[in-house]
Regions:
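Short substrate-entry loop that stabilizes the transition state in hydrolases
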Residues: 213-217
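Alpha/beta-hydrolase fold active-site loops
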Residues: 203
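Lipolytic serine-hydrolase domain surface
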Residues: 77-200, 219-235, 239-278, 295-312, ...
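Gly/Ala-rich beta-loop-alpha elbow adjacent to hydrolase catalytic centers
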Residues: 283, 287, 291
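Short amphipathic alpha-helical heptad-repeat segments
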Residues: 4-11, 29, 49-53
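The conserved beta1-alpha1 loop
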Residues: 206-210
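Short terminal alpha-helical segments
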Residues: 1-23
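Charged, low-complexity interaction regions
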Residues: 17-28, 42-48, 62-69
Length: 436
């Protein structure tokens, strides 16, 4: 029996439970489930069917009650695996939690990335380590993530799939958060200085995530980016207290504003206390709101002697008001060696944000494309791809996007010297677009 058939049969078997919990809304889900079953019977298994089934499950779980979510997850796993499944998550973390057994020796094509994190999330007792509520202090530490370099598409943040009946993460196939070790601020700085001294480059890459992201997934994404970009320095993560719930967009908006001064202090630490030569910052989506505010307030020309230079600043799909971004860009002009903005005309999440706010977002392209002095704007519409089903994570999920970012970070090339992009128009309205 195929994995797809087994999952469809299991979903059909719990239909009475789902009908009771969804009420009148179950009718549309039932019809879609029957349509998927009919396609399997008619056409057999296919990549398209698996993709649609995955999307169906995602919608089902987003809108389900906690009782229904439990029924769905329990139906999709063997009895012996139910106790090892992390409630509320999408993959199993082997040996997660402080003080647990170490992971076995890793295969040659798997690398472990230490992600040095700062977070203002509230600590959690579970495998999530940090939850979606605001904490009283900024916590520091190292999250260790294993990343396979083979059997995974460049940019892909792999994890087990329910519908493939994968219930445990496999280091040879999946990006896994293997451990999280907290420490004091002083210990964090000392450890970072020590490991930076052994790096191939005396550089730091700081990643700040966007809306609807858990601490675990933020750490996994930071490590995946470091590996796929072939970054030769050390990796930092600032994880603000996103609620990690697509229905709580406005909650995340309030939290990123609250978190901005914590992020700014973390950037200051990276610049002035680590001994790094260069700091690169990559912000995604709503995380750009904290980044632009930090750039507004940090005068890199007035940093103490021996501080790192703020080298490459990357605004990836920024979910910030376009007019506000333009105003702030004038204030932080010249504070980094180079600023680059990646935009797209096919970003559904940004279009949804525009619908909510009534005004264009800085990450949109076409008529809304932001072109300002001091920022290299790249229209990534031609190579845009989807990681979340919303065409919103192309910055980390498309080969040519990653190649261009790698040229920025590793070779510090200006756009005219980068292979993937070409100039469109002339100054002062010049921007860059991907070659056909």
């Amino acid at each position: 029996m195929s994995d797809t058939l087994r999952l469809l049969l299991q979903l059909i078997s719990i239909a009475p439970i789902l009908e009771q919990t969804f009420g009148h809304d179950w009718q549309s889900y039932r019809d879609e489930l029957l349509e998927l079953s009919g396609r399997l019977e008619r056409d057999g298994c296919s990549a398209a069917l698996d993709k649609d089934l995955d999307a169906f499950l995602a919608r089902l779980l987003v809108n389900a009650t906690e009782e229904a979510k439990g029924a769905i997850r329990k139906a999709m796993m063997p009895v012996e695996d139910k106790e090892t499944w992390r409630a509320g998550g999408d993959f199993y973390v082997a040996g997660a939690g402080l003080g647990t057994k170490a992971m076995p020796a890793l295969p040659d094509h798997v690398v472990e990335v230490p992600v040095f994190y700062g977070t203002d999330r509230e600590a959690s007792d579970g495998n999530d380590h940090f939850g979606g509520r605001r904490g009283d202090v900024v916590s520091y530490g190292v999250a260790r993530v294993t990343v396979p370099t083979e059997g995974r598409d460049l940019g892909e943040l792999t994890s087990p799939k329910w519908w493939k009946l994968e219930f445990k993460a496999d280091p040879e196939r999946h990006v896994i958060l293997s451990s999280v070790d907290g420490c004091s601020r002083a210990g964090f700085v000392a450890d970072l200085q020590s490991t930076l001294a052994t790096a191939d480059e005396n550089d730091l890459l700081l990643f700040v995530h966007g809306y609807n992201v858990t601490f675990t997934d933020a750490a996994r994404r930071a490590a995946q980016l470091a590996v796929d970009l072939k970054f030769r320095g050390r990796t930092l993560l600032f994880s603000w207290a996103s609620a990690a719930d697509p229905k709580l967009y406005t909650v995340d908006e309030a939290t990123i504003d609250w978190s901005e001064h914590h992020f700014r202090a973390f950037v200051q630490l990276a610049l002035t206390e680590t001994g790094a030569s260069r700091l690169h910052v990559l912000a995604h989506s709503m995380g750009n709101r904290a980044l632009v505010r930090a750039l507004e307030h940090i005068d890199t020309g007035a940093l103490p002697r021996g501080s790192a230079s703020l080298c490459q600043v990357i605004f990836a799909a920024p979910d910030i008001d376009a007019a506000k971004f333009k105003d702030l860009a004038a204030l932080f002009h010249g504070r980094a060696d180079r600023c680059t903005l990646y935009a797209s005309s096919g970003d559904v999440a940004l279009k949804a944000s525009k619908l909510i706010h009534g005004y264009a977002r800085a990450g949109e392209a076409e008529d809304s494309l932001v072109i300002v002095d001091g920022v290299d704007t790249v229209d990534a519409s031609r190579v845009d791809t989807s990681l979340l089903g919303l065409r919103h994570s192309y910055f980390g999920s498309e080969r040519s996007i990653l190649s261009d970012i790698a040229a920025l970070l590793n070779d510090r090339k200006e756009p005219s010297l980068r292979f993937d992009v070409k100039a469109v128009g002339a100054p002062p309205r010049q921007y860059w677009a991907y070659r056909e």
